[in-house]
From Swiss-Prot:
Name of the protein in question: Cbb3-type cytochrome c oxidase subunit CcoP
Keyword field contains Transmembrane helix: yes
GO molecular function: electron transfer activity; heme binding; metal ion binding; oxidoreductase activity
Gene assigned in the entry: ccoP
Family under the similarity heading: Belongs to the CcoP / FixP family.
Its job: C-type cytochrome. Part of the cbb3-type cytochrome c oxidase complex. CcoP subunit is required for transferring electrons from donor cytochrome c via its heme groups to CcoO subunit. From there, electrons are shuttled to the catalytic binuclear center of CcoN subunit where oxygen reduction takes place. The complex also functions as a proton pump.
Binding site for heme c 2: 186, 233, 236-237
Predominant subcellular localization, coarse grouping: membrane
Transmembrane segment boundaries: 4-24, 57-77
Pathway annotation from the record: Energy metabolism; oxidative phosphorylation
Ligand binding (heme c 1): 143, 146-147, 279
Cofactors (names): heme c
Length: 311
């Protein structure tokens, strides 16, 4: 900001405060010391305005507000290029400096705790109740918006509290997913196999692989669906539908792990148009130590205490 505009803003601001002080005291000079029956000539629905001074507390509130404004402008930037003299902020307060200061204080306080758990394996951290509580708080802040407060997911977002893992449910895979994120793509097969192929494959997957009944009146050829599946789907999902963690291809034998729904119509929609999903990387936001705690919490969700203790 140029010197001219800085001075203009400062002069206008301070001049306004001075004018308000003058106005308050100038209008107070002619007031009577006590109450009076004299009215100001204003009447509204039978209510008349008397010529009495403001209550003292009201007057002092005006003064206090102006004094607060002056102190604020001394401590914080508000008068053009003036940076303020708030203690603890070299060169004046800014919201960035306040954020950096608070982060630094938090790192100083909690850093040793995170470092202690980072030196342990994810499996070991998952057995520590205090660490799991810390991980749960991190999960609530950073993960619950997609996966839900109970970590059971929703349509398009996987359940983290069951045994179905697209990218692997071991501690290393979970931590890698959180650190680096995951990008998955199910290609659209509608044009390649046609509408009949879509219906046949969907029926085969639901009935033969997942063992779910087909709706009454379903018009589909399971034999042809199996053939098309072997030609186009097995390369990712496996001949038996066991899935492939390296590609994030889900296990088709367990419908409870299908994040886009298991109805015949939803399966057809997935095969016909494909699906795209992305788990954002959290390393730049949380850092390795916090991700380590978070991974331990997620790891503990699908493991009962006995299973965790055996690791």
């Amino acid at each position: 900001m140029s010197t001219f505009w800085s001075g203009y803003i400062a002069l206008l601001t301070l001049g306004t405060i001075v004018a308000l002080f003058w106005l308050i005291f100038a209008t107070r000079k002619g007031e009577s010391a006590g109450t009076t029956d004299q009215t100001m000539g204003h009447a509204f629905d039978g209510i008349e305005e008397y010529d009495n001074p403001l209550p003292r507390w009201w007057f002092l509130l005006f003064i206090g507000t102006l004094v607060f404004g002056i102190l604020y402008l001394v401590l914080y930037p508000g008068l053009g290029n003036w940076k303020g003299v708030l203690p603890g902020y070299e060169g004046g307060w800014t919201q960035e400096k306040q954020w950096e200061r608070e982060v630094s204080q938090a790192d100083e306080k909690y850093g040793p705790i995170f470092a202690k758990y980072a030196a342990m394996s994810v499996e070991q951290v998952a057995q520590d109740p205090q660490a799991v509580k810390m991980g749960a708080r991190l999960f609530a802040n950073y993960c619950a918006i997609c996966h839900g407060s109970d970590a059971k997911g929703s349509l398009g977002f996987p359940n983290l509290a069951d045994q179905h893992w697209r990218w692997g449910g071991d501690a290393t895979s979970i931590k890698t997913s959180i650190l680096n994120g995951r990008i998955a793509a199910m290609p659209a097969w509608g044009q390649a196999i046609g509408e009949e192929g879509v219906k046949n494959v969907a029926a085969f997957v639901r009935n033969e692989l997942a063992g779910l009944p087909l709706p009454e009146g379903t018009d589909a050829d399971l034999g042809k669906g199996k053939e098309v599946y072997a030609q186009t789907c097995a390369v990712c999902h496996g001949q038996g539908g066991e899935g492939m963690a390296a590609l994030g291809a889900p296990n088709l034998q367990h419908a409870s792990g299908w994040i886009y729904g298991s109805s015949l119509g939803q399966l057809q929609q997935t095969i016909r148009h494909g699906r795209n999903g992305q788990m954002p990387a959290q390393q730049q936001y949380l850092g390795n130590d916090k991700v380590h705690l978070l991974a331990a919490y997620v790891y503990s969700l699908s493991k009962n205490p006995e299973q965790v203790a055996k690791q």
